[in-house]
Amino acid sequence: MHHNYYLSPLAVALALGMVSPAKAADPILLQNASFSEVKQKFALSTQGVAVAKDSLSFVSEHTDRNKVTHVRMQQKYVGFPVYGGYAIMHSMNTAKSLAATTQSTVEMNGVVYQGLQTELGQPDASFVQNADKALQQFKAKYANQNVGDEKVIPMVYIDKDNQAHWAYKVSIRVNHLDKAPERPTAIIDARTQQPFVQWNDIKTERVSVKGSGFGGNKKMGYYEFGKDFPYLDLTRDANNATCYMENESVKVIDMKHKYSSVKAAMSFACSTTDSDIYSTGYREDNGALSPSNDALYAGYVIKHMYTDWYGVNVLSNSNGSPMQLVMRVHYGDGYENAYWDGEQMTFGCGDRMMYPLVSLGVGAHEISHGFTEQHSGLEYYGQSGGMNESFSDMAAQAAEHYSVGKSSWQIGGEIMKESSGYDALRYMDKPSRDGESIDTADEYYSGLDVHYSSGVYNHLFYILATKPNWDTRKAFDVMVKANMDYWTPYSSFDEGGCGVLSAAKDLGFSLNDVKSSLQAVAINYSKCH
């Protein structure tokens, strides 16, 4: 079977001799470092290929409205990525000119590690060859299951004590017949074959014509597209008189209460009309009139929110073109969840506790996991995982504000059944109201579920958005910019707070308001540059 490996020529050439750790790696907090110091210690590779033992390799760049270019770079040691080593350079220089510049005006954030040569030496000659062994051992835990999309990345892992280790990041996709898929992911010690950390990386939660139809559920009320909300954008094939629940931006797939499906859009017969407006009809399911209509509309709103407010695609293809949002509805049997799997959004129809999960807020949440994945890449465990979840909750409130001009400050309130005993899944004004989430960073402990650690940044967002002269849009402006230009995959709550301050400064917003909001949730900004 073919597996995906991520290696550079230098990595293979230098795989010569593994040694035991001698001392801890030395972290450099980049917001307090000088650009000249970093250039002396690390070769800057703007082509993404490591050319020296200690290097920073280009990942992506983004130029904001202030003409500042934010260049993301992954640390590599002898060609292998360093997990936790990540830099973002902020200057008037593009990535191509950054390596040659001598300017002291380059600002930075992130963390990189020096001293890896002393601690690690060179990897053993079998390090690369043993990558498949690590993957197969990890895969063996899921024997007799439907496994695919296997990946292994040889790397350097920095643990919580700043000890560096040769390691492998392994992941597989496990498809189930009776429940949602999983993406078990782990970082494995190359010496002991034991995991340092592990988590599930599935993030939960033709000719154009117009469509009319119904949406909503018993709790939020029912409404009509073409009357209460805009007409739906459809595609019609005149040759076979068929309309498709698809447009350039969004495609809706009917899972028919199964766990796998074809990739074709939902369709229905539609004879020619004088107005070129076609009734989608509706398929009532668990108290909702038409989950497919709601999904198509939610995708439209979310995509346009990111475009109208920020001039960016909510999701992009590898060539930078807009990615069509794929919304899979009627998923599974009694499935009370929704998730983003790296390619598409999937929505269950609920059961006893929930109505179908195709509300605007839930859709914005799942789609925005993809936005985070394509920008900061916040890892989905620990404090960065809480930030990842929280950004998607923020996006849910932003989508409500974009659509109806106000935010509910509840997550999932519109889909919870009255008989469930719950009025929402999470609360941004007081996260601890759900009995599990934390309100402040000093309440965090290792192993806390990311849906509960999200309370810190959810609370921060609410406090900031409700300050005088602020609103949901303005607060989301700050968080989007922090996600795009300042957060790294490994950001902690405090490091993320520095990114929020930097984003607010770039946008010309009140730093005192941001600082007081950070302080209210016990995020320490004293070390921010």
Curated annotation (Swiss-Prot):
- Catalytic residues as annotated in Swiss-Prot or TrEMBL: E366, H451 (proton donor)
Q: Keywords of this protein's UniProt record, alphabetized?
A: Hydrolase, Metal-binding, Metalloprotease, Protease, Signal, Zinc, Zymogen
Question: Kind of enzyme, top EC level?
Answer: hydrolase
Disulfide bond sites = none
Q: Where is the signal peptide?
A: 1-24
Q: Which cofactor does it need?
A: Zn(2+)
- InterPro entries to which the protein is assigned, alphabetical: FTP_domain (IPR011096), Peptidase_M4 (IPR023612), Peptidase_M4/M1_CTD_sf (IPR027268), Peptidase_M4_C_domain (IPR001570), Peptidase_M4_domain (IPR013856), Zinc_Metalloprotease_M4 (IPR050728)
Q: Which residues form the propeptide?
A: 25-204
Q: Name one GO biological process term.
A: proteolysis
Output one GO MF annotation: metalloendopeptidase activity
Q: Look up the EC number in the record and give it.
A: 3.4.24.-
Binding-site residues, Zn(2+): H365, H369, E389
Per UniProt, the cofactor note for this protein states: Binds 1 zinc ion.
- A Pfam family: FTP
Q: Which domain of life is it from?
A: Bacteria
Among SUPFAM superfamilies, the record links this protein to: Metalloproteases ('zincins'), catalytic domain
What family does the entry list? Belongs to the peptidase M4 family.
Name under which the protein is recorded: Zinc metalloproteinase MspA
Which taxonomic lineage does the organism of this UniProt entry have?
A: Bacteria, Pseudomonadati, Pseudomonadota, Gammaproteobacteria, Legionellales
